[in-house]
Swiss-Prot record:
UniProt keyword annotations, A-Z: Cytoplasm, DNA-binding, Transcription, Transcription regulation
Pfam family, one: Transcrip_reg
PANTHER family: TRANSCRIPTIONAL REGULATORY PROTEIN YEBC-RELATED, TRANSLATIONAL ACTIVATOR OF CYTOCHROME C OXIDASE 1
One GO CC term, this protein: cytosol
Subcellular location: Cytoplasm
Protein name: Probable transcriptional regulatory protein Msil_2305
Lineage: Bacteria, Pseudomonadati, Pseudomonadota, Alphaproteobacteria, Hyphomicrobiales
Family the entry assigns: Belongs to the TACO1 family.
Gene3D superfamilies: 1.10.10.200, 3.30.70.980
Superkingdom, natural source: Bacteria
GO molecular function: DNA binding
SUPFAM superfamilies named among the record's database cross-references: YebC-like
GO biological process: regulation of DNA-templated transcription
Organism, as annotated: Methylocella silvestris (strain DSM 15510 / CIP 108128 / LMG 27833 / NCIMB 13906 / BL2)
Length: 248
């Protein structure tokens, strides 16, 4: 298991669930509001908003919170958020991409830069590391919706590029352009996905020693904890020993 997914598993196993959930709801609400403001306020007519609402439902975000976030987009006092991508190098030369929604670019850039500096990394220019990743679509379904063979057949027929199936579920990968069409086709067959989004998938990963691995995970923890940061992607792998230490 590589990079970001390792860190996510650690966070879910730690005992700070209430604080994590509160911060998560805030980030989900921000994405819903931005998506609704950029397009129509109807999830059925706005692919990005639909994906944001699905992500919120998966995390058991209350329906009232979701509706309030959508309505906020059309309010006179609606905040304006800029979509910003930061790129940099973490310990061990790990490439890191950070996606944020911010109402103050200078504040967010300063905070992101400080996190990289704390662990001996460096914030770089946009484009410095993104060439090491593929910007693609990813659709996720629980394992129970169908067999690996059924998902693979349906996904390829719908125009997907790859399918990864396992005990945790099915992960369907698509081109940027085909994400919406494939998601709709698979939803018609298997029901609503648990997530449908654009991601940065590393082309290759770096295996880190334990000390460097801990520093990289610390960096990702700092980034994830920032209110403006929506997603973090990195091209690393760490040992089970490091994961066990952090989960303790």
């Amino acid at each position: 298991m590589a990079g970001h997914s390792q860190f996510k598993n650690i966070m879910h196993k730690k005992g700070k669930q209430d604080a994590i959930r509160s911060k998560l709801f805030s980030k989900l609400a921000r994405e819903i509001t931005v998506a609704a403001k950029l397009g129509l306020p109807d999830p059925n007519m706005n692919a990005r908003l639909r994906a944001a609402v699905i992500a919120a439902r998966v995390e058991n975000m209350p329906k009232d919170n979701i509706e309030r976030a959508i309505k906020k987009a059309s309010g006179a006092d609606a905040e304006n958020y800029d979509e910003v991508r930061y790129e940099g190098y973490g310990p061990g030369g790990v490439a890191v991409i950070v996606e944020a929604l911010t109402d103050n670019r200078n504040r967010t850039a300063g905070e992101i830069r400080s996190y990289f500096t704390k662990v001996g990394g460096a914030l770089a220019e946009t484009g410095a590391v993104s060439f090491m990743f593929d910007h693609i679509g990813r659709i996720e379904f629980p394992a129970k919706v169908g067999s690996e063979e059924a998902m693979l057949e349906a996904a390829i027929e719908a125009g997907a590029e790859d399918v990864l199936s396992g005990e945790e579920g099915h992960e369907v990968l698509t081109s940027l352009e085909m994400l919406r069409d494939v998601a709709l086709a698979l939803e018609a067959k298997f029901g609503e996905p648990t997530r449908a989004s654009l991601i940065w998938k590393p082309q290759n990963t770096i295996s880190l020693d334990d000390e460097t691995g801990e520093k990289v995970l610390r960096l990702i923890g700092l980034l994830e904890d920032n209110d403006d940061v929506q997603n973090v992607y990195a091209n690393y792998e760490v040992s089970e020993a490091v994961l066990a230490k952090l989960e303790a």
